[in-house]
């Protein structure tokens, strides 16, 4: 604080000049508080002030402040700077907690005061809000919790009663259906006996048609089985709700009635039990996975196991790394500094597009997650949890009563006895009366709450998908950046080992129990399994293909991709690590100057997300801004695709030809045709020099980069394809009985005409416009390896009404799937159903497939024309060259910033592979080493010969001739071009194994564009009289100079050895190395009461009990399948095939079996990111100021007990 270093001493006693008016906050507090209740307890003696009050008195007052007393002897403070008075000591902001959540023991937060009155006793003053109250504010939250618990118990009991009534009505429906089934069965038996005892013939003695009776019996049997499954499921849900309500009632009796407050030892015992339960749950989850694997193996042993598996399980579920396959691993001995040959990287120009595109997609995914979080926070503030479920139960009760009433009316119409008819009539009249009352009392708010709950479920589903996509992009970005790993100096060999502890400590304690660990993630209603074949990316309407509307690869859920990004500056990081500051083009910034971020910084994923967030994206936004400033209006936000034969506006047939075979290589250089994506509409004049240099930290070793020639483009199957157009063989048949359209996809002919990449599979997606939103309208075939021809031979049953059949058109999408599970649209075939006269019989026809390729040939031609015009017009050439230089410099800057983070990303990736034992061991070693490093760090910094050096950038502009739309574009199949490594590759400069202090210098060095402001502020540099250059050992040709201080290693060279700022309730740091400030978890920010501890304990016990029940159900299911297998059954039992939930369970077991360790780690990373996003939603609720975050979280806690989480369905009985 500014007044800690000096200021006016406070003066005790009367001030020199009394304040002209009493303190503004004195008048409200000096008024007598409201009269206490009739029975006022004996006033307790005023408690001694906490020790922190004495600490506040020991500090000097800030400059311009004075302490004084009023006529009653009360102390107040005068601020001569603003000429105001206050009851609050300004030093309390340093020594006292700010909120009740930060209080320890009997502390009161800033602005609160305990006052004793002779008549009333002890009361409390809130000087900030100018209020007084009799109740202790430290106990007020506990009473509020008890009140909310009692209110929720009333709502939960009403919902439980409605659930019980639903179960009873469904039980009545089941009994009626069972009675009808028995009567039909008895009727069939009587008729068969009458037929057997008669000798006059079948037609004269049978009262009913036996085939009709058997069909009716089969229909009633299916209905009876369905009702029995619903009863079993409802009984399970009812048991969960009953146990939850009983648990809450027991907590209410224990905590509210007797006012139980836990002591320290009791609270410690509860936390110990929570950690024990957490370990037991982890063990149970492992056993659950083992049981699922055994179930999958058992299912595969049956013949009809294919009936329960999904057609999409053939897709590889693992997330691979593009470009990693076939990369040879190179190793070297880094024991000597002169043994290092530079950087083992591919050509950065080939990696730049992928990295920038991934950065952009990652940024868009994070923005989508943030948008969904905002919407969820607003929705959760508007509704109570579990209120919509209770409203839905009431509506379901009305529907069940209506169904029972209809069944009673049908039964009464049949011939029954007089007693049965009278009993059923009385039941019918009672139901009609109850329905009239229910409809009269149904409120409009119930419907609105149900709609809000449906919207919340949809948003939670989108949040899960968006976090999964973000985690996938993050892993891809990390792998891509780590694949271009740079080698640091040999003198910094121990930097990785010394930094391991920071990662391990940031991962959090293994024994910590968070809110999501106890109560789990937010739950939502899963969609039906019937929609499992829905398309995983947004389909393009076929009618929009004829227009010149650009569309892009949709990598995620709907609304994820945008046609054009805004020009706002993303919040990216400028300098990512002190260790990488020497290899970056921007001056290092101090992490202590970073603003307080809203997200938690504890997890490695969060740190990695921030490290991957910024470099490419910042340059991309700058590039767009500069392009806009230069007047370039031809920069589309995303690459457009057009099918063959569908030209856009203003394009003729001559523009759809192949690209020119050669391009002039002179002042304008055309890159290789990854550059079909890279050509701008105007030619870019660049320098043809290729030069990248590595900086070996503080060793002074400077060697040019040795390029590698393994960076070859992917061959495309289309290069050797025949000239025949692709065609698909499809058969159509209308099933009038079930009102379905049978689509028989036979084979795909001439698939070589499609641009299928290597190692990609091909599948067909069938799309028919749906009748309503709840009907599945998209179906997917199995993915097949590329071959000629592709034989699918699959039949899809699509529900469609016969009257609407001729008005629809069937669309077949030919897609390819990469090993990284990326889908790419290859072609579309449209089938107009009106062209088929009659579909009563299967009709087979060949349909042509319109192939989708890049629209870059037109841009290539335009670029060539622009190059010719620029050759004729020198002025035009100069203007284009000016624009190109700015863009080229920015792209070169992007490359350098991306390289700066590569080492740290690779280290992070390696650290994540450590086991828990290794992490604990590294934590212990770091604790021992930090005490030594603290004492020796200052001496090392003096002995190392600190000097100032000039950070420079690569001397030559990197040749980047590409369009912005290509950077963000669709990943097309790569094609060979004239600018390939084999044709144009400079020979590497050979040097000896000594310290290289010589290199070529540019006579003129272009200045870099000034770095844009970022989220991290610049640290103040060391300023010395002269700049020392260490014999030109660093990259020459400085473009943007700054001063950097070097120690023995560059790990701490970018920060000052100053103390960290004071942070309350945190451990004293025992190292001077700066680390990212981390926010405490959600549980630590909240004031935890005894009621919270009891709820956490009971919730953990509930989760453990539910997990044990699931394990028992899985063991029983495995035992039943094993018994069926021992009896010699070759097919799955019928009770498995009839239950859709059991089939879904077996599909999930099959998916987990096909999962690899890498897939499992990616799934865990996605789940961890979803937990983090859920915590941030709670923080956003508190920021809205509608309700405190404690209130929202407590409501979620109590709603956990009455919200059933059924993951394993109950096993059905084989009989009815």
From Swiss-Prot:
Residues 21-51 have a biased composition (Pro residues). Residues 1060-1079 are annotated as: Interaction with PRKCZ. Residues 164-250, 354-468, 885-936, 1091-1160 form a coiled coil. Keywords: Coiled coil, Cytoplasm, Repressor, Transcription, Transcription regulation. Residues 570-598 have a biased composition (Low complexity). GO terms for cellular component: cytoplasm; cytosol. It is found in: Cytoplasm, Cytosol. Residues 1-63, 487-508, 546-612, 634-668 are annotated as: Disordered. Residues 59-92, 106-139 form the WW domain. GO terms for biological process: cell migration; hippo signaling; negative regulation of cell population proliferation; negative regulation of hippo signaling; negative regulation of organ growth; negative regulation of transcription by RNA polymerase II; regulation of DNA-templated transcription; regulation of hippo signaling. Residues 722-847 form the C2 domain. One of its GO terms (molecular function) is signaling adaptor activity. Regulator of the Hippo signaling pathway, also known as the Salvador-Warts-Hippo (SWH) pathway. Enhances phosphorylation of LATS1 and YAP1 and negatively regulates cell proliferation and organ growth due to a suppression of the transcriptional activity of YAP1, the major effector of the Hippo pathway. Belongs to the WWC family. Forms homodimers and heterodimers with WWC1 and WWC2. Interacts with DLC1 and PRKCZ. Interacts (via WW domains) with LATS1 and LATS2. This is Protein WWC3. The lineage of its organism: Eukaryota, Metazoa, Chordata, Craniata, Vertebrata.
């Amino acid at each position: 604080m500014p007044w800690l270093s000096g200021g006016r001493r406070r003066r005790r006693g009367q001030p020199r000049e009394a304040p002209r008016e009493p303190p503004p906050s004195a008048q409200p507090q000096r008024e007598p508080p409201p009269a206490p209740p009739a029975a006022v307890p004996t006033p307790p003696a005023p408690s001694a002030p906490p020790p922190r009050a004495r600490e506040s008195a020991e500090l000097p007052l800030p400059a311009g402040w004075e302490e004084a007393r009023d006529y009653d002897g009360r102390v107040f403070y005068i601020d001569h700077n603003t000429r105001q008075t206050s009851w609050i000591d300004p030093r309390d902001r340093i020594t006292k907690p700010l909120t009740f959540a930060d209080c320890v023991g009997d502390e009161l937060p800033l602005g609160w005061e305990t006052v004793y009155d002779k008549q009333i006793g002890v009361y409390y003053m809130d000087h900030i809000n100018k209020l007084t109250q009799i109740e202790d504010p430290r106990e007020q939250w506990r009473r509020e919790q008890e009140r909310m618990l009692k209110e929720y118990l009333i709502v939960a009991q009403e919902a439980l009663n409605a659930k019980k009534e639903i179960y009873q009505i469904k039980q009545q429906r089941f009994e009626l259906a069972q009675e009808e089934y028995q009567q039909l069965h008895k009727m069939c038996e009587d008729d068969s006996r009458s037929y057997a005892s008669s000798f006059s013939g079948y037609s004269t003695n049978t009262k009913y048609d036996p085939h009709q009776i058997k069909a009716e019996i089969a229909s009633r049997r299916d209905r009876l089985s369905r009702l029995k499954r619903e009863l079993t499921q409802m009984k399970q849900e009812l048991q969960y709700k009953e146990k939850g309500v009983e648990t809450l009632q027991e907590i209410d009796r224990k905590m509210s009635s007797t006012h139980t407050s836990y002591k320290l030892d009791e609270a410690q015992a509860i936390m110990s039990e929570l950690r024990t339960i957490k370990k037991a749950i982890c063990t149970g989850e492992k056993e659950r996975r083992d049981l699922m694997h055994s179930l999958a193996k058992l299912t595969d042993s049956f013949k009809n196991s294919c009936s329960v598996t999904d057609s999409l399980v053939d897709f590889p579920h693992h997330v691979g790394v593009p470009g990693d396959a076939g990369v040879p691993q190179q190793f070297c001995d880094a024991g000597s500094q002169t043994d290092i040959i530079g950087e083992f990287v591919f050509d950065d120009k080939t990696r730049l597009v992928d990295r920038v595109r991934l950065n952009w997609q990652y940024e868009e995914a994070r923005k989508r997650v943030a948008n969904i979080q905002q919407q969820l926070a607003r929705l959760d503030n508007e509704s109570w949890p579990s209120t919509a479920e209770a409203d839905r139960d009431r509506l379901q009760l009305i529907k069940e009563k209506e169904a029972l009433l209809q069944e009673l009316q049908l039964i009464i119409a049949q011939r029954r006895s007089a007693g049965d008819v009278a009993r059923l009539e009385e039941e019918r009249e009672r139901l009609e009366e109850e329905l009239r009352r229910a409809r009269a009392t149904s409120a409009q708010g119930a419907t609105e709450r149900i709609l809000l709950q449906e919207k919340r479920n949809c948003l939670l589903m989108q949040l899960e998908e968006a976090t999964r996509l973000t985690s996938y992009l993050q892993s891809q970005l990390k792998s891509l950046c780590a694949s271009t790993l740079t080698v640091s100096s040999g003198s910094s060999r121990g930097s990785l080992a010394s930094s391991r502890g920071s990662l391990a400590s940031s991962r959090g304690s293994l024994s910590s129990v968070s809110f999501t660990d106890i109560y789990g993630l937010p739950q939502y209603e899963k969609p039906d399994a019937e929609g499992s074949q829905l398309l995983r990316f947004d389909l393009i309407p076929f009618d929009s293909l004829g227009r010149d509307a650009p569309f892009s690869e949709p990598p995620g859920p709907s609304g994820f991709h945008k046609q054009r990004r805004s020009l706002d500056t993303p919040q990216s990081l400028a300098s990512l690590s002190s260790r990488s500051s020497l290899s970056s083009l921007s001056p290092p910034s101090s992490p202590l100057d970073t603003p307080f971020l809203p997200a938690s910084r504890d997890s490695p994923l969060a740190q990695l997300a921030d490290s991957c967030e910024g470099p490419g994206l910042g340059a991309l936004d700058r590039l767009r801004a500069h392009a806009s400033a230069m007047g370039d209006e031809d920069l589309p936000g995303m690459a457009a695709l057009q099918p063959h034969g569908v030209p856009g506006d203003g394009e003729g047939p001559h523009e759809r030809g192949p690209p020119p075979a050669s391009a002039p290589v002179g002042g304008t250089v055309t890159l290789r045709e990854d550059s079909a994506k890279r050509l701008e509409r105007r030619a870019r004049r660049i320098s043809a020099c290729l030069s990248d240099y590595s900086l070996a930290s503080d060793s002074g070793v400077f060697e040019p980069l040795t390029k590698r020639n393994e960076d070859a483009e992917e061959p495309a199957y289309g290069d050797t394809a025949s000239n025949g157009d692709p065609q698909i063989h499809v058969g159509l048949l209308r099933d009038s009985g079930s009102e379905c359209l049978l689509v028989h996809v036979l084979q795909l002919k001439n698939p070589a005409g499609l641009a299928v990449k290597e190692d990609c599979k091909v599948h067909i997606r069938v799309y028919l416009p749906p009748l309503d939103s709840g009907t599945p309208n998209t179906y997917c075939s199995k993915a097949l390896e590329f071959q000629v021809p592709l034989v699918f031979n699959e039949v899809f049953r699509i529900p469609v009404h016969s009257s609407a059949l001729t008005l629809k058109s069937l669309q077949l999408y030919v897609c390819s799937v990469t090993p990284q599970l990326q889908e790419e649209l290859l072609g579309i075939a449209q089938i107009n159903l009106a062209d088929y006269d009659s579909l009563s019989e299967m009709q087979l026809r060949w349909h042509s497939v319109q192939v989708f390729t890049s629209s870059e040939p037109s841009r290539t031609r335009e670029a060539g024309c622009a190059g010719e015009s620029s050759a004729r017009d020198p002025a035009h050439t100069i203007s284009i060259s000016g624009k190109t230089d700015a863009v080229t410099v920015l792209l070169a800057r992007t490359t350098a910033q991306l390289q700066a983070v590569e080492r740290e990303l690779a280290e992070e990736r390696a650290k994540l592979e450590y086991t828990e034992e290794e992490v604990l061991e590294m934590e212990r070693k770091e604790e021992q080493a930090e005490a030594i490093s603290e004492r020796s760090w200052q001496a090392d910094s003096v002995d190392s010969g600190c000097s100032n050096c000039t950070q420079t950038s690569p001397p030559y502009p990197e040749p980047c001739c590409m369009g912005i739309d290509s950077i963000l574009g669709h990943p097309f199949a790569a094609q060979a071009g004239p600018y390939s490594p084999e044709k144009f590759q400079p020979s590497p400069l050979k040097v000896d194994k000594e310290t290289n202090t010589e290199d070529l210098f540019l006579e003129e060095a272009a200045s870099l564009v000034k770095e844009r402001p970022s989220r991290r502020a610049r640290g103040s540099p060391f300023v010395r009289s002269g700049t020392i250059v260490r014999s030109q050992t660093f990259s020459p040709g400085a473009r943007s100079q700054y001063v950097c201080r070097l120690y023995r290693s560059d790990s701490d060279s970018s920060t000052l050895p100053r103390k960290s700022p004071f942070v309350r309730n945190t451990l004293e740091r025992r190292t001077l190395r700066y680390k990212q400030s981390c926010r405490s978890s959600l549980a630590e920010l909240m004031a935890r009461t005894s009621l919270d501890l009891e709820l956490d304990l009971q919730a953990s016990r509930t989760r453990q009990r539910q997990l044990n029940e699931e394990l028992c159900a899985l063991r029983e299911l495995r035992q039943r399948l094993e018994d069926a297998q021992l009896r010699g059954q070759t097919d799955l039992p019928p009770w498995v095939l009839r239950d859709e939930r059991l089939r879904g369970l077996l599909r999930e077991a099959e998916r987990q079996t096909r999962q690899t360790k890498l897939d499992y780690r990616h799934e865990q990373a996605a789940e961890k990111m979803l937990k983090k996003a859920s915590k941030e939603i709670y923080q956003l609720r508190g920021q809205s100021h509608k309700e405190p975050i404690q209130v929202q979280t407590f409501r979620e806690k109590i709603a956990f007990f009455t919200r059933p989480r059924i993951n394993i369905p109950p096993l059905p009985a084989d009989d009815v």
